[in-house]
């Protein structure tokens, strides 16, 4: 990721920025809203050759919308070379993971990096397998940290000039919990994170249930980061 700053007027690579309040609620790991927001950039190589855009769910998931847009707006041959970075408020579901894998098989010279704010229905075996399949196909998947949030704020959000450094800082514990669960998915371990949403008041709670297999296979630094070892 190459950091760029400044108002929209000096960023011709971006067609639309989202508003600060949109970014805050879409990418807060504690928020369990149904809609998905995708911020993406395509690097075609060379100087000044980065496309940036934003997308939200329509009648299709944002991942499918992106693939259709990418393959139909202009002609792309199988030898197309580019690097794509996605910043997703939710991780891909199982069906979207399959669509992404098929897309990458048709365009073998496309590299995809995915940063996610939350794991979508992470206890569903289909979603877990889908993420593993993506990783097996060469996709890099990571949980968004403060560094990625700041990058997205500067490059995808319509912030006022005086608020360039004032992007939302989310609780580190929630980020670490999703990192923990993502490791469980990658290693083929049972889910250990359970997330509950209470309607009154509007708060999100979590519980952790570790089995012996988690202690045996999860990297110690991941357990230490969440205070579990």
From Swiss-Prot:
Residues 10-134 form the CMP/dCMP-type deaminase domain. Binds 1 Zn(2+) ion per subunit. Its EC number is 3.5.4.-, 3.5.4.36. InterPro entries: APOBEC/CMP_deaminase_Zn-bd, APOBEC1, APOBEC_Cyt_Deaminase, CMP_dCMP_dom, Cytidine_deaminase-like. It comes from the Eukaryota. GO terms for cellular component: apolipoprotein B mRNA editing enzyme complex; cytoplasm; nucleus. Keywords: Cytoplasm, Hydrolase, Metal-binding, mRNA processing, Nucleus, Zinc. Pfam families: APOBEC4_like. It is found in: Cytoplasm; Nucleus. GO terms for biological process: cellular response to insulin stimulus; cytidine metabolic process; cytidine to uridine editing; defense response to virus; DNA cytosine deamination; establishment of localization in cell; lipoprotein biosynthetic process; lipoprotein metabolic process. It catalyses: a cytidine in mRNA + H2O + H(+) = a uridine in mRNA + NH4(+); cytidine(6666) in apoB mRNA + H2O + H(+) = uridine(6666) in apoB mRNA + NH4(+). Cytidine deaminase catalyzing the cytidine to uridine postranscriptional editing of a variety of mRNAs. Form complexes with cofactors that confer differential editing activity and selectivity. Responsible for the postranscriptional editing of a CAA codon for Gln to a UAA codon for stop in the apolipoprotein B mRNA. Also involved in CGA (Arg) to UGA (Stop) editing in the NF1 mRNA. May also play a role in the epigenetic regulation of gene expression by participating in DNA demethylation. This is C->U-editing enzyme APOBEC-1.
